[in-house]
């Protein structure tokens, strides 16, 4: 029996590869990507994720997941947070590191939220979260995956960018959120999401 398709809304093929690798062969859905334009919402991470997922479900007309990622500097009260995409685009990893020049507190946390919709208007949007603590450092490693070069997770001497993919996926914010999503789907004989509870994996 062929697996049902689950659309991951992204135009980033690196993200798709990482998501597929983390979910693994046991995941009961076939994950495919589609690059669609979604509005840029403002607000708290959960609100942003839920609204993006609702719009995506309407456009896809079927099961869909969307991801929202935050990089939060403790010295800045959690900013850039959900707006990290725009900071990264303007400043790059080096600029993100320079933002904390003069601040003693270099600690930060990476937060990932995956939102799932069955595509049915009456079904709730489910949120799966993962959080990894770390610090902002001078960029090291390849520059092909966002702000990975300047985030060093607690307990490690390497940045995300310097890590082997299997190591990063095991401890990253995205890995934790996807593990929660995977556990949820594997706990269901059929993905009838209405009665299920979401998990939150935090480090």
Curated annotation (Swiss-Prot):
Range of residues in the leader sequence: none
Annotated positions binding ITP: 10-15, 52, 68-69, 85, 145-148, 168, 173-174
Metal-binding in keyword set: yes
Catalysed transformations (reactions): ITP + H2O = IMP + diphosphate + H(+); dITP + H2O = dIMP + diphosphate + H(+); XTP + H2O = XMP + diphosphate + H(+)
EC id: 3.6.1.66
Gene Ontology cellular-component terms listed: cytoplasm
Chief localization: cytoplasm
Keyword vocabulary terms for this entry: Cytoplasm, Hydrolase, Magnesium, Manganese, Metal-binding, Nucleotide metabolism, Nucleotide-binding
Record note on cofactor: Binds 1 divalent metal cation per subunit; can use either Mg(2+) or Mn(2+).
GO terms under biological process: deoxyribonucleoside triphosphate catabolic process; nucleoside triphosphate catabolic process; nucleotide metabolic process
Gene Ontology MF terms in the entry: dITP diphosphatase activity; ITP diphosphatase activity; metal ion binding; nucleoside triphosphate diphosphatase activity; nucleotide binding; XTP diphosphatase activity
Chain sites annotated for binding Mg(2+): 40
Pfam families associated with the record: Ham1p_like (PF01725)
Compartment list: Cytoplasm
Cofactor: Mg(2+); Mn(2+)
Positions in coiled-coil regions: none
Family statement: Belongs to the HAM1 NTPase family.
Role played: Pyrophosphatase that hydrolyzes non-canonical purine nucleotides such as inosine triphosphate (ITP), deoxyinosine triphosphate (dITP) or xanthosine 5'-triphosphate (XTP) to their respective monophosphate derivatives. The enzyme does not distinguish between the deoxy- and ribose forms. Probably excludes non-canonical purines from RNA and DNA precursor pools, thus preventing their incorporation into RNA and DNA and avoiding chromosomal lesions.
Name used for this protein in its record: Inosine triphosphate pyrophosphatase
Lineage of the species this protein comes from: Eukaryota, Metazoa, Cnidaria, Anthozoa, Hexacorallia
